[in-house]
Structure formats: C-alpha cells, structure tokens
Amino acid sequence: MKASPGARSWIAAGVRHELLTRALPALRHDMAAPISVIRMGLLMLKRQVAAPGIDPEACNQRVDLIDNQIGELIVAIRSLRHWELATADEGITRSALVAECVALMRAAFGMQGIELEVDAALAPTEGETTWPQGAALRYLLLGAMGHLHDSIERIGAIAFAPEGADGLRLTASPRAELASQDPATDLHRAPRALAIDTVALQSLADDLGYAVTREGDVLRLLLGAA
C-alpha cells in the first residue's frame, strides 16, 4: 500500500521534529553559554560598584563584556528562525550549509566515535551560489546525516564532499576495529523506533521537494529543487 501525499507529509513532519530534537543540545548550548558569562559579568560588576573606590575602566570592561554576550545571545535566538519552513528566506550557500550542520552535530556524533570530515573543496569561496529555501536544505542535510548514522552499523566517519556544482556527497566509512569494541560509543544512538530509515528520509526529501539517492554507503543529494 502506497502512502498518500497527506501521510507522507505527516511522516516528513515527524522526521523534522526528530531532527530538531537531536539538534537541540547544540542550540541550547549556544543560548546558555552567553547567559552564564552575563551572570558572571553582572556579579563582578556588582562587586566593583559596591567597592569603596570605583574603577571606571574595570566597570567599562565588564559592561563591554556583557554587551558582547547579549549580542551573542540575540544571534542564537534569531537563529531559531532558520528552522521555520518559510515560503522564502535568504537562502544558504553550500559551504555554509555543511558548516552549520556539521557544527550542530559534531559533538553528538563525536560522543559515539563518529568523525565528520569536510572536504577542503567545501570551503567558502567568493561568488558562491546561494541556494533558496535554507531551512529546507538544513533539514535535508541533517536528515541525510541522521539516516547514515541510524542505518549503518559500526559507522566511524561521514565524509562530506561536493557533487558537481549543485550537490553534496556523503560517504560513510566503518569504525576502526579497536573503537568498535568499545560499547560506550553506542550508548547515545537513537532508539530504533525513532531511526531515520529509508522511508523516513525519502518522505522528508519528497515533502521538501529535493532529490536524494543512496548507493551502498554513499548518499547524494541535490541542492536545487527537484
């Protein structure tokens, strides 16, 4: 029995929710870190103001620190809009897409002994093409990463490389034999019931309007709408 378009959209919505849940620790850290620095800065500023002799220069340094961290917090909060599937957004370049998704998931994958390797050809370049629908592309790439993570046993690394002028190639490689013997690396794997399998990834790609293909341990995706 083939899933209806409505059912496919519900599956895709569930996949997007799961991907956001997996990215939340990194997003939470980006917002919590400035708050910790702000609290410490306010405490130090309070002590300096209460001291018998106020040092204006030291107080100004604390104020500058707090102002800087407020700016970092604002950037982190505003980044939440990147997860909204708006009808149109500012778009994203291929290099920025890979950099953002790798930064979001590097710690989580690293805890499981999975390295994320980015080809030098994906470094930012002047005049690089900006692809529309940045939010959709973030979900697509994170979904591809999650699919390889969930579907390949003893995965040790995912390599990111350009595929032509408008695509990405993700290649999974096995974990080193010594690392594969450490059960601690599998403690944080997603429950099988929440695994992003082939049906889940294809439903996500179809709903977002992009082409994704997998051959063995290699997954390819196109950044242009299908």
Give each language-model segment a name:
Residues 115-128:
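Conserved catalytic submotifs in the C-terminal HATPase_c
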Residues 163-202, 224:
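Glycine-rich/acidic phosphate-handling loop/turn and adjacent ATP-lid/helix
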Residues 2-3, 9-12, 16-23, 31, ...:
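Histidine phosphotransfer helical core of two-component systems
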Residues 41, 58-117:
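Conserved DHp (HisKA) dimerization/phosphotransfer helix of two-component histidine kinases, i.e.
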Residues 105, 109-112, 145-178:
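An N-terminal amphipathic alpha-helical segment
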Residues 21-44, 48, 130-163, 194-208:
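Conserved ATP-binding N-box helix of the HATPase_c
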Residues 206-220:
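Glycine-rich ATP-binding loops of the HATPase_c
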